[in-house]
Amino acid sequence: MAKATDVRPKITLACVECKERNYITRKNRRNDPDRIELKKFCPRDGRHTIHRETR
């Protein structure tokens, strides 16, 4: 099982516009302590939108 204080936890990225959770990725907590935002393709909207980390 993964520890709660894992350095590279799995995070879910949700589209800002349609709120759909499209991507699962990992991040390094030491380099990015805040929530990350990435511009990714949203299949529901059919275009590139900002995806924000969800908890």
Swiss-Prot record:
Annotated coiled-coil positions are none
- Which Gene3D superfamilies would you find in this protein's record? Ribosomal protein L33 (2.20.28.120)
A Pfam family that this protein carries is Ribosomal_L33
* Keyword set, alphabetical order: Ribonucleoprotein, Ribosomal protein
Superkingdom, taxonomy of origin: Bacteria
- One record GO biological process: translation
* InterPro entries on file: Ribosomal_bL33, Ribosomal_bL33_CS, Ribosomal_bL33_sf, Ribosomal_zn-bd
Matching entries from HAMAP family are given as: Ribosomal_bL33 (MF_00294)
Family affiliation: Belongs to the bacterial ribosomal protein bL33 family.
* UniProt cross-references to PANTHER family, sorted A to Z: 50S RIBOSOMAL PROTEIN L33, CHLOROPLASTIC (PTHR43168), LARGE RIBOSOMAL SUBUNIT PROTEIN BL33C (PTHR43168:SF2)
The protein's name is Large ribosomal subunit protein bL33B
Q: Which gene encodes it?
A: rpmG2
